[in-house]
Amino acid sequence: MADGIDRRNDDRLEFSTSKEVTVAPTFEDMHLKESLLRGIYAYGYESPSAVQSRAIVQICKGRDTIAQAQSGTGKTATFSISILQVIDTAVRETQALVLSPTRELATQIQSVIMALGDYMNVQCHACIGGTNIGEDIRKLDYGQHVVSGTPGRVADMIRRRHLRTRHIKMLVLDEADELLNRGFREQIYDVYRYLPPATQVVVVSATLPYDVLDMTTKFMTDPVRVLVKRDELTLEGIKQYFIAVEKEEWKFDTLCDLYDTLTITQAVIFCNTRRKVDWLTDKMREANFTVSSMHGEMPQKERDSIMQDFRQGNSRVLISTDVWARGIDVQQVSLVINYDLPTNRENYIHRIGRSGRFGRKGVAINFVTSDDVRILRDIELYYSTQIDEMPMNVADLLS
């Protein structure tokens, strides 16, 4: 567990995986560059997780790869290590491109690549919206081996010819379910059109609904699959509960009651819209509760500063939209409250996966009005899980 990956159930994971995939039990067995191995060990990894031991070698062989694994299993390091193995740092041109659905995730991936590539003199730039375009242009003109970005800004930089694509050999789509939802689909096609025809494509996500798998056929050739069966995807160690609140207006009082009874280390409260986030934040502050909030419409600098405060533990309770739910590592989070149930059932696992990340125990509490009962049952069926009514002693479960 020192390396931050929960391996307790690796032996029980069922892999619906291509026949040709072999397991590499150690990083040495993957025949990685010496400088990369040094970075991997310095980062704190000792041995590969289940998904790493299956996917890295296939990606390094140049195979198009679909890797599905739950939060906290080392997905980001899977493609980061693969990228660092295949790039040539002597050529200062962009050779790998990673697309993510949120700016925070793109920035986090950049920091993982820089850390793992610490002994390789690698250049990696986070190319994201909401930041200074001039800085992007300067960094890209200087030459970056890897670019981690959001689809809109990356497509823009390619169109302006600052992000040169002729040397790109790998495209990674992280959190592919969210990326390929309607919002980003066109922008991904835009980017893909500019890439060399032989570009390798790697798709990584905790959830891969069938329509997404279907779509990947458009830009993947005979992909290798490393898939964890879906009903394994509700994270063990997370206790899931619901509170019946009958009416929407009662949710606020319920939340205030919870504040008094729970001694929380850190908590995230999810709402479905940015307007609701702002409204709830104001209401909580009026009631003298200290909370911070974040959503996609905030300026990037403000979002960065809120994330940093939360990471460092300076702020204890964060109210957010789903922009926060995707892949952000904050290890102290022990409680997630779905003030609103997610409108997209795939987002449920991304939200609650936050609370038990890296094998930490966590509690997820869903506020359920009479209108929400059907959605809750749908989530239970989809993930083959059981969500019980919250017991009185919920504070004990967090301690």
Curated annotation (Swiss-Prot):
It holds the Pfam family Helicase_C. Its EC number is 3.6.4.13. It is an enzyme of class 3 (hydrolase). It is found in: Nucleus, Nucleolus. SUPFAM superfamilies: P-loop containing nucleoside triphosphate hydrolases (SSF52540). Signal peptide: none annotated. Gene3D superfamilies: P-loop containing nucleotide triphosphate hydrolases. One of its GO terms (molecular function) is RNA helicase activity. One of its GO terms (cellular component) is nucleolar chromatin. A motif (Q motif) lies at residues 25-53. ATP binds at A69, Q70, S71, G72, T73, G74, K75, T76. It catalyses: ATP + H2O = ADP + phosphate + H(+). Keywords: ATP-binding, Helicase, Hydrolase, Nucleotide-binding, Nucleus, Ribosome biogenesis, RNA-binding, rRNA processing. PANTHER family: ATP-DEPENDENT RNA HELICASE DBP3. This is ATP-dependent RNA helicase fal1. It comes from Aspergillus clavatus (strain ATCC 1007 / CBS 513.65 / DSM 816 / NCTC 3887 / NRRL 1 / QM 1276 / 107). The gene is fal1.
